[in-house]
């Protein structure tokens, strides 16, 4: 081999490459361990109405350590997404010494049961709110479907000048509504058929629906009414 210039050149090239790789790895390790390039600032982007600065600082305190190169960006993101009102967080490095976090908050659409909220994507979360919100309830995993049906039911009753204040999906998967004038409606289990029956009732009721406190729409060709005095 020592008399073969071609093999000697190949060996020399291999050794040079190996030395370069070792130097690169050494430089990377030094950069990761170096006290230089500390993260000096974390900037927060996004429209925040419910998340307090103190909550963000507490979430970041245990996660922002190391330097610009070694800081655990995924860990910072996960810590921010554990805050009650943060739906999604994106975190990136900005040279030379900054992290930038963009936060998206939940937009509460309704209360879910006694202790949770549901956002406009039909996702349940736990967060405090004093807003006057409609109330949803249903089996676990039905949040998205209840949210979607709420939008449609609300659209249907608009001509009556009322709003849907409560949507219930029972354990037997039957739909029930309460309007903001106190009227309750039983819609049955078939949600698509329920929408059709609700449309038919709205057309018939015009603005007289406030005279009734209960409407049973589970009949295929009509509906039953109960008055405030208990008469049908």
Regions found by a protein language model. Give the residues of each.
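Charged, solvent-exposed interaction patches on well-folded alpha/beta domains
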Residues: 1-41, 50-67, 71-82, 88-232
């Amino acid at each position: 081999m020592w008399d073969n210039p071609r093999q000697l050149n190949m060996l020399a090239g291999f050794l040079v490459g190996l030395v370069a790789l070792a130097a690169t790895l050494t430089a990377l390790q030094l950069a990761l361990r170096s006290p230089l390039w500390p993260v000096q600032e974390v900037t927060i982007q996004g429209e925040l109405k419910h998340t307090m600065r103190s909550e963000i600082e507490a979430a970041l305190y245990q996660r922002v350590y190391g330097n610009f190169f070694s800081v655990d960006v995924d860990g910072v993101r996960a810590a921010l997404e554990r805050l009650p009102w943060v739906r999604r967080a994106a975190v990136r490095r900005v040279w030379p010494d900054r992290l930038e976090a963009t936060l998206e908050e939940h937009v509460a659409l309704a209360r879910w049961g006694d202790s949770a909220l549901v956002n406009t994507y039909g996702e349940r979360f736990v967060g405090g709110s004093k807003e006057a919100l409609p109330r949803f309830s249903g089996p676990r995993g039905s949040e998205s479907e209840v949210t979607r049906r709420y939008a449609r039911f609300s659209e249907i009753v608009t001509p009556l000048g009322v709003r849907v204040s409560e949507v219930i999906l029972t354990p037997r998967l039957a739909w029930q509504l309460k309007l903001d004038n106190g009227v309750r409606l039983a819609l049955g289990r078939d949600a698509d058929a329920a929408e059709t029956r609700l449309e038919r009732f709205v057309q018939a009721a015009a603005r007289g629906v406030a005279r009734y406190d209960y409407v049973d729409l589970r009949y295929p060709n009509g509906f039953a009414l109960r008055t405030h005095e208990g008469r049908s």
